[in-house]
Amino acid sequence: MKKWKASCLIWAALLLITGCGKAVYIETQRFILTHAIELNDEKKLVMYTSSSVFSRDAKERYKITTTTVDTMRESKYKLESKINGNIASGKLQSILIGKNMLQQTNVLSYLDVLFRDPKNEINANVIVVDGSVKEVMYMKMSDKGELGGVIKQLVESTYKGRISVLTTLQKFHQQMMDSAITPCLTEMRAEKNDLVISGTTLLHLDGTYATSLNNQESSLLLVLQHNMNNPIPLTFHLPAEIFHTDEEMSYASINIRKAKANFKTKFEENHLTIDIQMKVQIELMERMFTLDMEKQSKLLEQAIEQELKKQCDALIKKAQKHQVDPFGFGIYVRSQDYKNWKKVEDHWGKALSEATVNFTPKVAIKSTGVSE
């Protein structure tokens, strides 16, 4: 009897439950996958959005919407008046920022709303556009797919290929808040009817544009950051006279498989010295000249070692020239000598530019491929 009464109560409760209420149809939802911002000539914020379209009657798979506003929060209301459907938050994949905007202002203040709303996606990738943001957003993608998906896949595949960095919105915020490192962002540009990852954008401590790195320099940046999640590809032009070959054939390509770094920092009479010793294990991917590897492998190791040091030294000097620290050297200084770090914390970029940085790699070839 008790079981029967309990069953009746359960069925009565189920009958009174209203369920999910009004049905939600995907055709009426608008998922914003890409935000893009730049400043116009009047210093107004121009915002572009790419949202997916699921209607069977639509000819395009996504819609680009443009608004001119003072703040990103204000753009939400204007978007709602232009997009037919409900704007669903939490699906953002990419945030594009015009380089011209970074050259004028700290963009973090404009992105403030994205950090405050818990519904927003803070794992979206932050990308700098070298050129017109409008050109990128209105590029024809009929043979490539939906714009938001194309940008996300391009950025993540180039990072996996280790020729650019990958900075999420959350990571960008952390870099901006940490005085021991300066931000580095993926850089992209439009070439004819293609989107190309051209390298990495470096920012000052105040969030303004400092300089750009090409793809080779971006790979070296990952080495100096000790970011070894995947093999890092590098191609070097080695001294032709050492290997008795022509200049146009004196190339070798490698993958850095492992790297173990030892950082030491010291202050002497207020002058900072950073010593970096790095053991690097590589595999030979390409060699365009003849060489007896059994007898001359050490010669090749030394040549690659010297070229790696030369290019890393040039990259460090480039960062020092612009008073930026995308490598995170400041993190090591802070952890090893906190007392002296507090003296330079507020002007770390300038302090690094005046410091002596010694980079000493030790290269070992662990694989030469099946052809040897």
Region spans (language model):
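Membrane-proximal alpha-helical signals and transmembrane carboxylates
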Residues: K2-E372
